[in-house]
């Protein structure tokens, strides 16, 4: 029960943060609130890929790098994303809009290559569609 409560608390903290991450002072507060050690809170925060202890962009792009996506030319999608965003994995665009991350598997093998942006799935990707997807995400977030 405490583990679920901690994960819920960490989700809430991260969602409230402008930079989409878990600041150390708030992880310490979560430890006190839940009665879980600071070390355990940090361990949970760094174990799950949906959490970050470093500032990130407004939108999180996760690209699948597992076998199905790799065999479906995911590397071309990665190259296009890096070119458009001018970032590498683990980096955030200068405008703070996007952070690019890699994922071992998104569970979307039937529509490989695949990625998620803020947990919204995108499959059957081709490099030619990446610019439009990013433009729409950025536009929709301004509404």
Where are these regions (language model features)?
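Signature of N-terminal electron-transfer/Fe-S-associated modules in redox systems
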Residues: 1-143
